[in-house]
Amino acid sequence: MPKPAAGRIDETRPFQPVRIAVLTVSDTRSEADDKSGRTLVELIERDRHKVAARAIVKDDVRAIATKLREWIADPAVEVVISTGGTGVTGRDVTPEAFESLFEKKIDGFGELFRMLSWGKIGTSTMQSRAVGGVAGGTYLFALPGSPGACRDGWEDILRWQLDIRFRPCNLAELMPRLQEHLKK
């Protein structure tokens, strides 16, 4: 396993796979030619997590939000990672769909994604509206639609934050507490 830029894996802790749904947002892709979705699936499985579901939806706020709500309600899904629709064109509406459902936005995810992308694509990173947040006890992350962006988002951020062994802290260990405000 490669080393993260900062932090470390605590090998004394057992690995716990996370159940992840992969959503491709595209008007033109099918599963046969969905390179970005396939990239995410391969990376998730390589790192021993579970692909709980996979789907492709059109660039439409309602279609995206409907699929997200379905997965948020599904106890078999702990995390959703999407690819596509995060740019600035008229059809790019993934962030709007995600943010309409967020109970809490994870601002640092988009900020960190763009910071890391700066070293690879320079000022073009300003076109990315990658977002992350929490809804219904489920983590939601929206990545751009290129295989490279999916690889970067997974390799540089999510693989570490979804590994309960990552130190000094990680998002995986917070999953049991995401809905503690609902408990009395």
PLM ranges: what are they?
Residues M1-K184:
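Non-catalytic beta/alpha edge segments that cap or flank active sites
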